[in-house]
From Swiss-Prot:
GO terms for molecular function: metallocarboxypeptidase activity; zinc ion binding. Residues 1-17 form the signal peptide. It is found in: Secreted. Its main location: secreted. Binds 1 zinc ion per subunit. GO terms for biological process: proteolysis. The gene is MCPA. This is Metallocarboxypeptidase A. Extracellular metalloprotease that contributes to pathogenicity. Belongs to the peptidase M14 family. Pfam families: Peptidase_M14, Propep_M14.
Amino acid sequence: MRSVLSLALLAANVVTAAVVSPFDYSGYKVIRVPTQKDNVKEVQRIITDLNLDTWKYPKSEGQNADIVVPPSQITSFMERISGMSMEMMHEDLGMSISNETSFEAYSAGYAPDINWFKSYHSYQDHISYLQDLQGLFRTRSEYVDAGKSHEGRTIPALHIWGSGGKNSKPAIIFHGTIHAREWITTMVTEYLAWSLLSQYNKNADITSIVDNFDIWVFPIVNPDGFAFTQTSNRLWRKNRQPNPNARCPGRDLNRNYPYQWVGPGSSSNPCSDTYRGAQPGDGTEIKVHIANMKRIASYHGIAMFVDWHSYGQLFMSPYGYSCTARPPTDARHQELSRIFAQALRAVHGTPYRTGPICNTIYQVNGDSVDYALEVLKVKLSLTAELRDTGARGFVLPADQIIPSGEETLAGTVAMLKAVIRG
């Protein structure tokens, strides 16, 4: 099985911010094959034999295989899966990407307006939007250049506070886009920030949340990878930091945190999408984020950390590294996860599954949630996989942004109200 990284190597052999031609996915299909006891090994063999990329790899029976099939392999692939059930996620992946990347031109007038959320946007427009949004609420927020990526891009953050003033309350930290291709997380974390700012003193629940917590929103944790998905390869996942093997740049930043770093939930292969890095915490962006989280924790601690991902419609708790270990706060984590999922579903009927990371999605080593809980002693550490469950996957149409934001806000508000109640 190739990683999505290998497609980028066909497009460009680069490890810097050089501009290259985008990889062309025209004619590629994304096909879901549900696995069962009698076919999971065969599906794994097909993926290996045809050297196919996957969005979801079936490690065991009952898991879906979401498979990227190039035009040259369509006939062979369809022959091999004959008799198995399948679902077409993208008939033409190139066309889906083209539709998704029709960015609307940014205007500063979008800052207080929901129109910003009708389209995806370029990295630089996100920076402009965050600065303009903060400029409308100067007494209750600040725009922060939280540090620089490996290629020198700003890692942006919005800091939001209420009646007590900044740095006066326990912190809530939201992370988005640690995996570059998960564009919906950029927009949803910005939707949360926009709502918390614009609805303060208008919505009683939001006002209470902002008054009770110092809120930090990091919409683009991995700016180099994010920019690369917009210029070169839409399906890039990792950062853009060089490795000893120059053909395979990048670390999976969510396998690079220095806690339970080695294990089956990450890879030592630089060409893997889950490459953990050469050393724990050696990712440029991870160093920046650890420093920021430690600084934030030094004020009044961190009440909650949420790392937003896509896709799968899941809301999950520790641990990623172990499928048997549970933190002492497991019951509280599960309770809040259920509250989040129930409130979210009430908005548009979107179902979310909940549970510990390892048991709910797969085993993960060196991830942000386990690190935040065990090393930084964050009280509550959680992660989400946003829309959808695979109908469109990573290439989620722009008309899904606003409903995703609406339901995620509802879940988040309900969960934080429960935290305030104790």
